[in-house]
Amino acid sequence: MEVLEAVKASRSVSKFKSIPIGDDKIQALANAMRMAPSAENLQPWKLIVVSDEDLKRKLSGAVMNGRGLPNAPIVLVACAKLDEATATVGGYMNSYPVDVGMAISYLNLAAVNQGLGTNWVFSFNEEKVREALRIPEGAAHVVALTPLGVPEAPDPPEGRKHTGELLSFNGYE
C-alpha cells in the first residue's frame, strides 16, 4: 500500500473483532515505529503491549470513556522515556511529545497497511495507567493509549478541512 493510500484509509476504530494479533505483526509495527524521526535521533519512546484482560480492564478504568479498550485484543501504551528526550533548555520545548507522536503516527500507518485498526486515546488518568503497568515514577511519561485489532467496522469518515483553511504562506493569516 502506498503511504498516501494508508493515510487516506486511516480511521479511528472503536469496535474490534476478537481475532488475536500475532507477535510478528506487533514486531512489524514496532519496526515501523522505530523508523520515525526524533530530535537528535534519540528515539525516546517505549511501547508497552497489553494483552492481559485484567490489565486492559484497569486501563479502561483510567480512560475518560473507556472507548474501544475493552474489546480490543491489544492495547498499546506509548511512553516517553524522559531521560532519553531532549531537555527543555533556554525556553525551548522538550521534544518528547512530538517525537512520540511521530512514532505513533508511523505505527498507525503500518497498522492500516496490515489491515489493523487503531484509535489514539489521550483522555486518561496517567497515574492510574502508571500504577496498572508498574511504570516507575520519573522513568516515563504516558503519552497515549492505542487499542489495536482487526476492525469490526471502521468509524465513519469525518469531514476534513480544505487545504486553504490549513495553509498560509510567509506568515499567519
PLM ranges: what are they?
Residues 25, 30, 35-103:
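Glycine/small-residue-rich phosphate/adenosyl-binding loop
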Residues 82-83, 124-127, 152:
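Acidic, glycine-rich active-site loops and adjacent beta-strand->loop/helix elements
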Residues 3-22, 144-173:
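C-terminal helix-cap and adjacent tail motif
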Residues 67-72, 135-157:
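A glycine-rich helix N-cap at a beta->alpha junction
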Residues 33, 76, 91-132:
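Small-aliphatic-rich amphipathic alpha-helix that forms the alpha element of a beta-alpha
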Residues 25, 52, 130-132, 149:
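Short Asp/Glu-rich motifs
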